[in-house]
Structures are given as C-alpha cells and as structure tokens.
A protein has these predicted regions:
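Long amphipathic alpha-helical segments used for membrane anchoring, targeting, substrate engagement
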Residues: 1-81
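Short helix/loop segments within enzyme catalytic domains
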Residues: 92-116, 213-269
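Extracytoplasmic
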Residues: 93, 100, 116-119, 137-140, ...
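Short pre-active-site segment immediately N-terminal to the catalytic Zn-binding motif
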Residues: 159-182, 213-219
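Post-HEXXH active-site segment of zinc metalloproteases
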Residues: 193-218, 222
C-alpha cells in the first residue's frame, strides 16, 4: 500500500498518552450485560468481540440489547479536545487513511447535492471515554459511535489482525491495507449514519419479533459497511490513476484485505471460540459474506451496489 499521495486528515483526536479514561476524572466501567446497551448506543462494536475474550452477546449479539433502553448510561463528557495530525508513523498512517476517506466521501455526497461531515477518529490505548455506553476499551475492537460521530480505535487491534486472526503477514506492506480496510469499515458506519440508514435499522431491530431477526438486520448493516469500504478503495485507486499517479493499492493488498475479512467473519470467530457455529447469532456476517461484499464495493466503486437490505443474496 502506497501512502505517498494520500491526504492527511486533521480530524484525529490522539488520546494515546493519556492512559486510562482520558478526561473522565476517574474510572468507570463499561455498562454491558443485563440489556444495558441499545443499538442506538453502539451500532457497531467494531469488527470483533469474542476472540478477545468478550462474549459477543454482551456487545452486539443479543436481541435484549438491541431492544434495550433508548438512552444509554453515559458519564459526563470530557472537556472539548483538539484534533490534529499525529506525527508518529502509526498516527500519520491513520491520518492518511482517514483523509482519503474524507476526500472520497465528500465527492460522493457532493454529487447528490449533500454535504459530507467527516467523523473524528479517536486513537487511544487501553481505555478511554466514549459517548456510547461511557467507555471504550481495547477488547471491544474498533467501533463507531453515532452519539458523538466518532470512530474509536486502539491501534493494538492492528497487531491482533496479524498475530491472532492471521489476516495478514506481520510487518508486510499488504498488512497496511488490511488496517486501512478496518478504518474504512468504521467510516462506512458513519456514512450510513449520515444517510439515515442506521436510525432506520435501529427502528427495524426494535420491531423485530425475534433475536435472530434483529441479528439479521445487524448483519445487513455490517456487510453494507464492508461494501462501502470497498467503494472507498476503488475510488481512491481510480482517482490516483486518473491523475497520472501510481495507484495506492499494490499487488497483494486486496488479497490481504479479503483474508482479514475472512478472519473476522462470525463463523470463523465462533468456530475458533466455541468449536461450532450458530448462524442465527451472527451479527457481522460470515467470512464468505464479508469477502464478497467488500469485493462488490471494490469492483463497482458505486454506493448503489451496496444495498444489502434489498439484495436477494446476503
């Protein structure tokens, strides 16, 4: 993956040096369990839960959570923070990927006469304050919070992709594109939020007559975010080529992203954690589905190809 021509974003909130819960003025726990989180509180608690030791039913898998209280328990928000462009290698990488998503989604929205308001990406280590449920913790994986329109990312998850999930080769350039896919997936949730898709999905989940039906809607949301990540990658690559610049995607990059998508599919994670698969409990989609929908967006470069809610084959 070539980073040279990607623009940097100043919408990065770097909390990595704060430790603990930045700005919270004291510790507080993540209010999970007992139906304490609604889908409106945390729409996508990232790409994983269980392989890091968290029961997914406590995060996003349970109908009792999806139909839980409409107002999550939230600690008093920290003081306003400054965003900037980080200067370390990892921070600049994240900034460049985020900057690229901003450029591409601004263009897509502008074509429809809409304004794209980019999310803020919060970098942290260990744990930090979030407006969804009170806290972000590294074991939750990356996630998007609709309440504050921020993406939360503990970059240690990138190490997990290579070492624990074996989604890419440690230290390789292709591993960077797998990491970019993770960021683009979460930004995809922000796009869904701006387009009104997430609120409609929330309403549909609350009206669902079973846990399996509510989970199915969540899978549709997640697979669409995978597809939108593919759309971003296609558009950035084609734009650079049209400008006479080398594409930012290099040989092996897409394959690495597909390996990552497969590694964090619900069936793969369930089989690894439990030894068996329960399809009705899926919340993000199978390995095959995640690969296919990312590829759908990447090959088409069109948002219209990402309508998982109307597709005959999910």
């Amino acid at each position: 993956m070539r980073l040279d021509d990607l623009p940097e974003s100043g919408n990065v909130e770097d909390r990595r040096e704060e430790g603990g819960f930045g700005g919270g003025g004291g510790g507080f726990g993540l209010p999970i369990g007992g139906g304490g989180l609604s889908i409106g509180a945390i729409v996508a608690l990232g790409l994983i839960g269980w392989a890091l030791g968290i029961d997914p039913s406590l995060l996003i898998g349970g109908a009792e959570i999806l139909t839980g209280p409409s107002q999550p328990h939230v600690q008093a928000p920290p003081t306003a923070r400054r965003t900037s462009v980080p200067q370390d290698d990892m921070g600049r990488f994240v900034s460049k990927v985020l900057g690229s998503t901003e450029l591409q989604w601004k263009q897509v929205f502008a074509k429809d006469g809409k304004t794209y308001r980019p999310p803020v990406l919060v970098l942290y280590r260990g744990a930090t304050h979030a407006s969804c449920g009170g806290a972000a913790q590294s074991a939750m994986g990356p996630f998007y919070c609709p309440a504050d329109q921020k993406v939360y990312l503990d970059t240690s998850f990138f190490d997990q992709i290579a070492t624990r999930f074996r989604g890419c080769d440690v230290g390789s350039r292709t591993c960077q594109f797998s990491q970019a896919y993770v960021i683009a997936h979460e930004v995809g949730h922000h796009v869904q939020n701006l387009l009104g898709i997430l609120p409609k999905a929330q309403q549909a989940q609350r009206a669902a007559d079973s846990k399996a039906a509510a989970n199915h809607i969540q899978v549709q949301v997640e697979l669409q975010a995978d597809c939108l990540a593919g759309v971003w990658a296609n558009r950035e690559n084609e734009m650079l080529k049209s400008e006479g610049k080398p594409p930012f995607i290099e040989p092996g990059d897409v394959e690495a992203a597909l390996r990552t998508a497969a590694a964090i599919g619900d069936d793969t994670l369930q089989r690894r954690a439990r030894g068996y698969v329960v399809p009705d409990s899926f919340t993000h989609g199978s390995s095959e589905q995640r690969q296919r929908w990312f590829n759908t967006g990447f090959r088409s470069g069109s948002v219209t190809s990402c309508n998982t809610f109307a597709s005959a084959q999910l």
